[in-house]
Amino acid sequence: MDLDEVDRKMILALIEEPKASLRTLASEVGIALGTASVRLKSLQEKGVIRGWSVDLDPQAIGWEMCVIVGLRIEKGKMMDVQQRIASDPRVFSVYDVTGDFDSIVMARIRNRQELNDLTKEVFSIDGITRSFTHVVMNTVKESTVTPPFE
């Protein structure tokens, strides 16, 4: 989807201050309040803005560890395996990938015991032929928002 300058400015303003009022947003972008309302609604209807959420600090709520797991999955079982994995509340991302793995899974866990449980309960389900678990030691950058422009 092509975004014009006004759309880009609105998105950047919302990334900086997601709780900004519509009036503040319009002022920041330099457009009329009605225009801001119409543009925001349009961005939501087109799926550019998928929703509104809270950005939590995982460690502050007890998720001490993050793991990245590469999976090799039997041919013909990819979708079923991924759906089952995605249903686990500790899992926050499941990707189809190219390269050495068929899928990459990212999960947050509280401790080593939970890593053991996750490995035995989730990463050993039927259809997974091999898993490669990597524990994140330090996070340099993590963001759920990536603007589609410079």
Kindly give the residue locations of the regions a language model identified.
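A compositional/biophysical signature of low hydrophobicity enriched in polar/charged and small residues
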Residues: M1-E150
